[in-house]
Amino acid sequence: MSNQTTVTEFLILGFSDIWELQILYFIVFLVLYLISLLGNLLIITAIALNRHLHNPMYFFLINLSILDFGYISVTIPKSMANSLMNTSLISYYGCVAQVFFYIFFASANFALLTIMAYDRYIAICQPLHYEMLMNRRACVQMAASAWISGILCSALHTGNTFAISFCGGNMVDQFFCEIPQLLHLACSDSYLGEVVVISLFMLLSLICFAFIIVSYVQIFKTVLRIPSQEGRHKAFSTCLPHLIVVSLFLFTGTFAFLKPTSNSTSDLNPLVAVLYSIMPPMMNPIIYSMRNKEMKGALSKLIGWKLFSKNKMSIFLH
């Protein structure tokens, strides 16, 4: 116990300690962050302004966009600030907050994707009961349950992680405070901690994943029984974006928690983290805007209206 020291801050090693490369990473992260910010903001605005999209599916999509924006905002701004100021420091409590909110947004995101699968199941397999089962109160309660489950899951993960002692080692081989890397700095054997973290993650993931799979099996069986090709295409078009988003989230989430911590190549850790911490919130708006006809129309109308307003204003000023 005499060799233990209190850790008051962590060093986020990130990608490189070379100033020129840090500026390059700052520019790349800024572009990715702005793409995610603009994409999710357009989704939210387009749905809010289009009365035809005021239904449960798009209500959940607004929640997803908010969670996506929070998810990427937990890690990217701090990393960009460190790169710009040529520093690697983050305070102990700053690291605690980053871990808490990162797990919160990730867990709530997955819970919401599960709810969205249920919404598509009711819409396609039980259309006559859709308005009764997916009324406004039910939708608000389901969305709230996703956010609350994120808080509970995050509290468990964060509490388990920071209950351990750090023996003076404070260098985190990542561009943000990541649980597997923090457990690697533990004084005592962190094997039990890693098992608890991975077990909790896998339990939540398996429950949600099983629910999503069962929902889509029923959806596909129902869609294949639709006699008209146009009807089948319309049903698939509302499900395909969600299915792609779920696959992307699960694929990248598997990288996050199942990659080895002790034997992983340090140079690859930040690059792999980009895959699961930046790509989903950046790609989700693109997937929904490209694969959903109603969303594409709403976005085109929104962007066209803004361009028209700008042109009209410029003509008026001249």
Explain the meaning of each model-derived region.
Residues M1-H318:
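Transmembrane helical core of 7TM receptor-like proteins
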